[in-house]
Swiss-Prot record:
The lineage of its organism: Bacteria, Pseudomonadati, Pseudomonadota, Alphaproteobacteria, Hyphomicrobiales. Pathway: Porphyrin-containing compound metabolism; heme A biosynthesis; heme A from heme O: step 1/1. InterPro entries: COX15/CtaA_fam (IPR003780), HemeA_Synthase_type2 (IPR023754). GO terms for biological process: heme A biosynthetic process. Its EC number is 1.17.99.9. Coiled coil: none annotated. It is found in: Cell membrane. The gene is ctaA. Keywords: Cell membrane, Heme biosynthesis, Iron, Membrane, Metal-binding, Oxidoreductase, Transmembrane, Transmembrane helix. Belongs to the COX15/CtaA family. Type 2 subfamily. Heme binds at residues 271, 332. GO terms for cellular component: plasma membrane. Its cofactor is heme b. It comes from Bartonella henselae (strain ATCC 49882 / DSM 28221 / CCUG 30454 / Houston 1) (Rochalimaea henselae). This is Heme A synthase.
Length: 358
């Protein structure tokens, strides 16, 4: 029998109630994901990411207890290149500080996975999930589990026999981008269950809003490469780099494409100038939406995205000039996540809510 679709405007009171409950659950997942990324940023900025050298998905929740267990954990850390090359004078007390950052990051990851899985089981059991969103909701805990595997794959690049004193910038960037995919997916899904007073925008506006999200994600990716290469610690001037608008040495690696991933100068250059491009595209998008849907909520959201990107650019400049202190680095990352979430919400709003299934 064919499934009949109903518009969002004629949702039954029960459907509205069920959707709001699922939204609350998805928002809790989203907040936990944002917290994980921010704690992960602090873990990276404090050099704590390699402090736990084993992956124990179940038993890893329990931290060391007593001096003997702490000494054992510290001894494991002393076997990796980061300790041998950078931290030979580290004390047990100092080790505990970096350990707790990484431990908190991992425990939050387990918590969000648990919230996603148990919530899915609960809402499915009480039949609150509409057929047209069931598959998307099943994907949420799968994406989170995959992200956990990627996290360990990233950490593995800096332990064992590795000569790296930090994780691979490639794996770090991939880890952040997969986290962003989870955030995008959960935001998009939750906003698809929202109620909207305005009508969906034209398909062209929808496509433009979607591509803006893609550009923001690309900028986040290059920001992750900047972090992985510690590229924010060099060329701490603006608007020029080393006294030049286009500095020498952008293409010093062979093959040329390698500069986009392993040359700190090139990576910072691309991150800077892609931000200018992103801001320009966001302005065009805002005026395009205003032209097509004058004085609409869609248009106001589009202009607010421009404001957020401008604020983020200013924060980026200040963070660079200050040589990336931990506080500014985390604020810069937080605003990036806020822009990503808001742009996804804007994109979903241009499409309207999911139609209900009768």
């Amino acid at each position: 029998m064919a499934v009949k679709s109903l518009s969002n405007s004629i949702l039954t009171p029960l459907q509205k109630k069920n959707r709001k409950q699922i939204q609350v659950w998805l928002y809790s997942i989203l907040l936990l994901c944002l917290a994980i990324v921010l704690v992960g940023g602090a873990t990276r900025l404090t050099g704590s990411g390699l402090s736990i050298t084993e992956w124990k998905p179940i038993h890893g929740v329990i931290p060391p207890i007593g001096v003997e267990q702490w000494q054992e954990e510290f001894l494991k850390y002393q076997q990796i290149a980061q300790y041998k090359m950078l931290n030979r004078d580290m004390t047990l007390s100092a080790f505990k500080v970096i350990f707790w950052w990484e431990w908190a990051h991992r425990v939050l990851g387990r918590l969000v996975g648990l919230v996603a899985l148990l919530g899915l089981i609960w809402f499915w059991a009480i039949k609150h999930i509409e057929k047209n969103v069931l598959l998307q909701l099943i994907i949420v805990p799968i994406l989170i589990a995959f992200q956990g595997v990627v996290g360990w794959w990233m950490v593995a690049s800096g332990i064992g026999q590795s000569n790296l004193t930090s994780v691979s910038q490639y794996r770090l960037a991939f880890h952040l981008i997969t986290a962003c995919f989870v955030i995008i997916f959960v935001t998009y899904l939750s906003q698809g269950l929202a109620e909207y007073s305005e009508k969906p925008a034209s398909h062209r506006v929808q496509y433009f809003a979607g591509w803006l999200v893609v550009l923001i994600l690309i900028e986040v990716y290059f920001g992750a490469l900047v972090a992985g290469l510690h590229a924010g610690k060099v060329y701490n001037t603006w608007p020029l780099m080393d006294g030049q608008f286009i500095p020498d040495g952008l293409l010093q690696h062979d093959p040329i494409w390698l500069n986009l991933f392993e040359n700190p100068l090139t990576v910072q250059f691309v991150h800077r100038f892609f931000a200018y491009i992103l801001f320009f595209v966001a302005i065009i998008h805002a005026f395009y939406v205003q032209k097509n849907i004058p004085h609409s909520i869609h248009a106001r959201r589009a202009f607010f995205i421009c404001v957020m990107i401008a604020v983020q650019a200013l924060l980026g400049i200040i963070t660079l000039l200050q040589e990336v202190p931990i506080s500014l680095g985390l604020i810069h990352q937080s605003v990036a996540l806020a822009i990503l979430c808001f742009s996804v919400a804007h994109w979903r709003a241009t499409k309207g809510a999911y139609r209900a299934i009768e």
